[in-house]
């Protein structure tokens, strides 16, 4: 449906499943996405500022609020806000500040540390 809708638009390319999402993300200045845990974690690890689109109540909203609170993302409720934030981020120093905040909040050994804590706890009981 999207391919048909945008078939005449040279500025839009619709991709299906891709094995090389990391490459697409690394070549991006900003990522517009839902606030799912895996995607925003990948963006954090890749240091790509986020525009989180219309997060649903629950985990997505909490993820979005956390990233916004720490100035690592903007939350857009509609397409107009997405465009506003893209223009804002690409024309100001905001995007660099978001990248700095992402570097500060990224914990590269988080999984390892969690496993170590669990093993330490299990050894103590």
Region roles according to the model:
Residues 1-125:
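Nucleotide-activated sugar donor-binding and catalytic core shared by glycosyltransferases
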């Amino acid at each position: 449906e999207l391919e048909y809708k945008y078939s005449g638009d040279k500025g839009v390319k619709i991709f299906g499943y891709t094995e090389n999402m990391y490459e697409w993300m690394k070549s991006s200045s900003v990522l517009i996405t839902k606030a799912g845990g895996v995607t925003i974690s990948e963006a954090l690890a890749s240091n790509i500022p986020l525009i989180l689109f219309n997060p649903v109540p629950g985990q997505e909203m909490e993820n979005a609020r956390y990233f916004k609170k720490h100035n690592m993302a903007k939350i857009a409720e509609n397409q107009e806000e997405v465009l506003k934030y893209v223009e804002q981020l690409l024309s100001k120093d905001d995007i660099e500040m978001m990248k700095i905040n992402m570097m500060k909040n990224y914990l590269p050994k988080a999984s390892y540390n969690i496993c170590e804590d669990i093993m330490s706890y299990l050894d103590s009981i």
